[in-house]
Curated annotation (Swiss-Prot):
Induction: By UV-B.
Organism (species): Arabidopsis thaliana
Region (Disordered): 1-114, 197-294
Protein name, entry field: DNA mismatch repair protein MSH6
One GO biological process term: mismatch repair
Compositionally biased tracts (Pro residues): 56-67
Keyword hit for Transferase: no
Pfam families: MutS_I, MutS_II, MutS_III, MutS_IV, MutS_V
Length: 1324
């Protein structure tokens, strides 16, 4: 049997005579296949595979192909509707009798018995045949085109162009004699023009609308009259009309009538459409045969820009990956490759931007595309509309709204098929789509993978289009569409898109000024703007940085921006290299300086206009030059006003803000963001004045080497300090914890306040903490939800009034609003219940956090207002807010008016009862007619002459009086006003909610801090071994910083995870009175040196964020910065070797470390010659000991350093203890004790590590011998050199002292210099 074929997503014109949406990009007639008429009226022309495979989605095994490959149709999925099956003899087609020349069926070929073999040969080639598909229970028409004698199989080409290799003797077939389908087509084609004239003249709804109705069946998007195209496309439209006649055999009047009826229904839903869409999105492409093509240029999809290293020094350009990223392959290549390469040369070798610049032009803009006029002329209106959007946004995937579906065409369809797993629709043009309800899911998938998405929405309905054409005389046949959103990693705002990722997604705008742009050795001046769109937070700052961009590296490592905005070709090479090195594949946007990336003056002007519009300020406060006049800056936020008055000190920060606002304006987020933006100052990161900071500095190297947020395995959270401490229950708490870890406290009093709070939240108060966590456990991300409420009152982007959406967005908004109110109420109640702990213990920080009116706002009155305003449960269920009386003045007034008219109608009823003398007269409603006065038939003679008879039935008549008609008109208008007020009530209530924005944000902030404090209290329970509250003390009386730990464990590593029993704690003491400030640490490889260094650093961080430390005792004077040089790695993307990377990090430490810093150097000097490495290591160590005089650890395998510093009181020699045993072949076996022990270790025992690594025994034994030889040589040369040096030094001293022979002493000094070099060389 033939392989399963992908089901065809066709629809029968009997259900809807409109063509598929694939005709939106219909090909010209010259390239289209001749359509074959179909006699079937079936609702869906989907062919089920003939195979008996019980799972129709799983194709049956394909038969062996014939030796001669049949010529396949290069366009198996043309624009023509899928073929309709021919009915079997027992189920004749309802339209079959309408053919003027009925076909002659030469008998049905039954399935032959197994003992009978029917064979066919060349005699049936060219004949018409019908093949029965058992699972479809239908017949399909085709013709035999080829016979393979070797296989004994015939190739049958069906009417839709698909081919199948069959053994006709084993198939159920019918042989057809009579009029060929081609003749039938030609006969029908003669009547096409007349039909088309009737259809288009009688109904102005255009073919584009037909396309969209076919998909949504409730959209009526009325787009394009494809028949009125130029050249060959007219012929195509005529042929399409012929298909309608052949498949429907309907009278022209019936066609027009049905079309008119369908286009009048805007919200109709089609079951057939659902089946079609389900097939195109869910089912996989089966055995559909595709023609293969040797195409040279293939259109690719669009991937996001990524940061790549500059190709050479001074080159700041970055490669924008666009068309080259998603290469067609497999079926897509065979199906679309040839067409794409032939039709779109302007996307390949003839590529130009909108200003007709070639890619080789230095000002070439890859975001835009020049469309050749000849190409544009051949486009229909709908096609032209799509290409106009695409040509301006070539770096984005276009979600093009057509009815209830978002469509992806051409190169964007390849992205949808690849990344969203959406199947291509039928047709030669790449095309796929998905329903409106899947918008959030699909757009998040693309954005998370690094794509930019342009959302094009309909802003006009078909009825509005028709009305516009009548009123203005416009000839437009396409509904209006507008760009309503640009969604990227940094502009995700929808709650559904952010549910799985509580981390802040920062969009970072960065600019640079000063001498560093021309002088590589000069210091850098940066302006930075960080925007978290989801929480409406804007962080602004300007700072100076060293030539290695250390502060910028720290900022990038902490914030990890997902998107970067920078002025094109402005940043220095060092800055570009830092971005490459310290980011994780962000989306990079290069804006044109000044026109797109604004300077400070332009920024103040543009932002000022926005705030003036928000505050309803008159525009006259600005001069024609765009400068603020008088006190025009008073409406700006305080922070922006201060930056504007600082002149040069704030100009770069304002410029960065300008770049961010311009970018957000393209995404329709600028005004909604600024309206309720929360401005913050950039955390101080100038390392030269670190003592002015309120926080400890953890630079990029420390964050990475200590694995604070990212592990070294895969960059995830597992095994990091953040993962260990993160037991937060709220999303805002998780984000706050990351901030605390990135910037631990430096102020002693603030640290103690946190420690007090953490201590109180456990122990006997643990039940209160658990209850607090339980209350918050089901809350959504309240910080983002509140921000979304703030932005929802701005009718812009997809929230715009003109946007045509079929999803009930109003109901969704009401439900989110109620969720926000309930969340705020829950947070307030949780904080209130936690206040009970203050009765037992006191903590300044907790008292401040839990006292209403201080950090905790008093929101009880606000919550009561909204509870009294409407029923939350009813509103959440219905999606409509019905306000209680007194909640909304406008609605109350409308209700009162309605009641007045209803009261007047009741009064009028009483009057009529009295007039006619019958109390049984009453109002009734019949159909849409209300307030019909129902009068008994016996009183018909007494009815006044001005009564209007509306209807009657046996025994009664129904009337309208003039008064009733007048009151009904007024009542209808009053009800309309009431409904209008009801529709806007939710927006007014949200507006009142936004009036208290500071309260809601304070509530979230207080709740988040309490959540983090409880998390720190709980996290200490997971430590292995004991824990203690660290003692934070000032320096000793002589001003020497100190650190002391007893029984210090590791906060992250546990013995059970290591699989070696319990973790070995250690005692550490550095600094303080009469104590060495540095530990020179030696020991065997794998002895635990690096682990000890890390655990000390992590313990200091824990102590200064207010958490407990895994130790018996821990005391430290505050550390202002932790400087870490640890691990071996290179930065190839930044052009740095391992050794250069180590020295670069060390250079930063040398220039930035202070007396209060903690310096950790792990095996500095490796990666180069031993002499060079040891010389550098000793020089660096000496600098920290003698010049900086800070606390620190220096681990090394240069054992000569231990000899040199064994008498230095500022250095404590220690090693990681081990036991040595004799192994096989003289190889020493080392047992690691992991205990910090005083004294130096004589060896590193590297051969033991080689043994553990599994090196062969003969290699190990040879290594032992070589090791002994090197040690013997070192000892001999060492003793020999010492004797020679001693003799020479005595000679020099004697010679210089006597001063008798200057030339001799000079020669002696030269010899001493030579001997010193020899000594250094031999001792290494």
């Amino acid at each position: 049997m033939a392989p399963s074929r992908r089901q065809i997503s066709g629809r029968s014109p009997l259900v809807n005579q409109q063509r598929q949406i694939t005709s939106f990009f219909g090909k010209s007639a010259s390239s289209s296949s001749s359509p074959s008429p179909s006699p079937s009226p079936s609702l869906s022309n989907k062919k089920t595979p003939k195979s008996n495979n019980p799972n129709p989605k799983s194709p049956s095994p394909s038969p062996s192909p014939p030796k001669k490959t049949p010529k396949l149709n290069p366009n198996p999925s043309s624009n023509l509707p899928a073929r309709s099956p021919s009915p079997g003899p027992d189920t004749p087609s309802p339209v079959q009798s309408k053919f003027k020349k009925p076909l002659l069926v030469i008998g049905q070929t039954p399935s032959p018995p197994q003992s009978v073999v029917i064979t066919y040969g060349d005699e049936v080639v060219g004949k018409q045949v019908r093949v029965y598909w058992p699972l479809d229970k239908k017949w399909y028409d085709g013709s035999v085109t080829f016979y393979d004698k070797g296989e004994g199989k015939h190739v049958v080409e069906y009417e839709d162009g698909e081919e199948e290799s069959l053994d006709l003797g084993k198939e159920k077939t019918e042989w057809v004699v009579g009029e060929k389908s081609g003749d039938r087509f030609n006969r029908l084609k003669r009547g096409a023009s007349a039909l088309r004239k009737v259809v288009t003249d009688s109904d102005d709804d255009v073919e584009m609308g037909n396309v969209e109705e076919d998909k949504s069946d409730g959209d009526d998007s009325s787009d394009e009259d494809w028949g009125k195209n130029v050249g060959k496309e007219v012929c195509e439209s005529e042929e399409d009309d012929v298909e309608l006649v052949d498949e429907n055999e309907m009278d022209e009047e019936e066609l027009v009538e049905e079309k008119d009826e369908e286009t009048s229904k805007v919200n109709r839903v089609s079951k057939t459409d659902s089946r079609k869409r389900k097939t195109s999105e869910v089912t996989k492409s089966g055995g559909e045969k595709k023609s293969k093509t040797d195409t040279g240029t293939i259109l690719k999809g669009f991937k996001a820009s990524v940061v790549e290293p500059a190709k050479k020094i001074g080159q700041a350009d970055r490669v924008v990956k666009g068309l080259e990223d998603n290469v067609l392959d497999g079926d897509a290549l065979a199906r679309f490759g040839a067409r794409d390469s032939e039709k779109f040369r302007f996307l390949g070798v003839d590529r130009r931007d909108a200003k007709r610049r070639r890619p080789t032009d230095e000002n070439y803009d890859p975001r835009t595309l020049y469309l050749p006029p000849d190409f544009v002329k051949k486009l229909t209106g709908g096609q032209r509309q799509w290409w106009e959007f695409k040509a301006k946004h070539m770096d984005k995937v276009v979600f093009f709204k057509m009815g209830k579906f978002y469509e992806l065409f051409e190169m964007d369809a390849h992205v949808g098929a690849k990344e969203l797993d959406i199947q291509y629709m039928k047709g030669e043009q790449p095309h796929c789509g998905f329903p409106e309800k899947n918008f959030s899911v699909n757009i998040e998938k693309l954005v998370r993978k690094g794509y930019r998405v342009l959302v094009v929405e309909q802003t006009e309905t078909p009825d509005q289009l028709e009305q516009r054409r009548k009123e203005t005389g416009s000839k437009d046949k396409v509904v209006k569409r507008e760009v309503c959103a640009v969604v990227t990693k940094g502009t995700l705002t929808d709650g559904e898109m952010l549910l799985t990722n509580p981390d802040a997604s920062y969009l970072m705008a960065l600019t640079e000024g000063g001498e560093s742009l021309t002088n590589p050795t000069a210091e850098h001046n940066f302006g930075v703007c960080l925007v978290d769109v989801a929480t409406q937070k804007i962080i602004l700052g300007q700072f100076k940085d060293d030539q290695d961009c250390s502060a910028l590296s720290c900022l990038l490592s902490e914030m990890r921006p997902v998107e970067i905005i920078k002025p094109a070709k402005v940043l220095s090479y060092a800055t570009e290299r830092t971005i490459v090195r310290q980011t994780r594949n962000p989306l990079v946007n290069n804006l044109v300086p000044l026109s797109e990336f604004w300077d400070s003056e332009k920024t103040i002007y543009e932002v000022g206009i926005i705030y003036k519009r928000i505050n309803c300020q008159p525009s006259s406060a600005y001069s024609s030059e765009g400068k603020i006049l008088g006190d025009g800056s008073s409406f700006l936020p305080k922070m922006l006003s201060e930056l504007a008055t600082e002149d040069k000190n704030g100009s770069l920060a304002l410029s960065a803000l300008g770049g961010a606002i311009y970018y957000l304006r393209q995404a329709f987020l600028d005004e909604s963001l600024l309206r309720f933006a929360k401005f913050e100052s950039l955390p101080y990161c100038d390392f030269s004045n670190v003592n002015e900071k309120q926080h400890m500095v953890l630079d990029a190297a420390a964050l990475e080497n200590l694995e604070i947020f990212e592990n070294s395995r895969n960059g995830g959270y597992s095994g990091t300090l953040y993962a260990q401490l993160n037991q937060c229950i709220t999303a805002s708490g998780k984000r706050l914890l990351k901030t605390w870890l990135a910037r631990p406290l430096y102020n002693t009093e603030l640290i103690k306040e946190r420690q007090d709070a953490v201590a109180i939240l456990r122990g006997e108060n643990l039940p209160y903490s658990l209850e607090f966590r339980k209350s918050l456990s089901r809350l959504p991300d309240m910080e983002r939800l509140i921000a979304r409420m703030f932005s929802s009152i701005e009718a812009s982007g997809r929230n715009g009034d003109k946007v045509v959406l079929y999803e009930d967005t109003a109901k969704k908004q009401v439900q989110e609003f109620i969720s926000t109110l309930r969340g705020c109420e829950t947070m307030a109640e949780a904080c209130s219940s936690l206040r009970a702990i203050l009765k037992h213990d006191t903590s300044r920080r907790l008292l401040h956090l839990l006292t209403p009116g201080q950090s905790l706002p008093n929101i009880s009155s606000s919550i009561k207002y909204f509870k009294d305003a409407f029923d939350w449960v009813e509103a959440h269920n219905s999606g409509r807010v019905i306000p209680h009386e007194g909640a909304d003045e406008e609605y109350d007034c409308a209700c009162k008016t309605v009641e007045e008219f209803e009261s007047s109608l009741k009064k009028h009823l009483k009057e009529q009862r009295k007039l006619l003398g019958d109390a049984s007269i009453n109002y009734v409603t019949v159909g849409k007619d209300e307030y019909l006065l129902e009068v008994p038939e016996s009183l018909s003679g007494s009815v006044p002459h001005d009564y209007e008879l509306c209807s009657s039935k046996k025994g009664v008549s129904r009337y309208w009086t003039p008064t009733i008609k007048k009151l009904l008109k007024e009542l209808s208008q009053a009800k309309s006003e009431k409904e209008s007020a009801l529709k806007s009530i939710s927006q007014r209530l949200i507006g009142r909610f936004c009036e208290h924005q500071e309260k809601w944000r304070q509530l979230v902030s207080a709740t988040a801090e309490l959540d983090v404090l409880i998390s720190l209290a709980f996290a200490s329970d997971s430590y292995e071994g004991v824990r203690c509250r660290p003692v934070i003390s000032g320096s000793t009386s002589d001003g020497v910083p100190h650190l002391s730990a007893t029984g210090l464990g590791h906060p992250v590593l546990r013995g059970d995870s290591l699989g070696r029993g319990s973790f070995v704690p250690n005692n550490v003491k550095i600094g303080g009175a009469e104590k060495a400030s540095f530990i020179l640490l030696t020991g065997p490889n794998m002895g635990g040196k690096s682990t000890l260094l890390r655990q000390v650093c992590l313990a200091v961080i824990l102590a200064q964020i207010g958490a407990d430390v895994p130790a018996e005792t821990f005391e430290v004077s505050p550390v202002d910065k932790i400087c870490v040089r640890m691990g071996a790695k290179d930065h190839i993307m930044a052009g740095q070797s391992t050794f250069l990377t180590e020295l670069s990090e060390t250079a930063v430490m040398l220039t930035s470390a202070t007396r209060n810093s903690l310096v950790v150097l792990d095996e500095l000097g490796r990666g180069t010659a031993t002499s060079d490495g040891q010389a550098i290591a000793e020089s660096v160590l000496e600098h920290f000991i003698e010049k900086v005089q800070c606390r620190g650890f220096f681990s090394t395998h240069y054992h000569r350093l231990s000899v040199d510093y064994q008498t230095n009181p500022k250095v404590s020699l220690c090693h990681m203890a081990c036991q040595i045993g004799e192994g096989i072949g003289g190889v020493e076996e080392v047992t690691f004790l992991y205990r910090l022990t005083p004294g130096a270790c004589p060896k590193s025992y590297g051969v033991n590590v080689a043994r553990l690594a599994g090196l062969p025994d003969y290699v190990l034994q040879r290594a032992v011998i070589k090791s002994q030889e090197f040690e013997a040589l070192y000892g001999k040369n060492h003793r020999k050199t010492d004797h020679k040096l001693a003799a020479m030094i005595k000679q020099i001293i004697s010679s210089v002292a006597s001063d008798s022979d200057y030339s001799a002493s000079k020669d002696s000094l030269c010899e001493l210099h030579s001997m010193a070099n020899t000594f250094l060389r031999l001792t290494n």
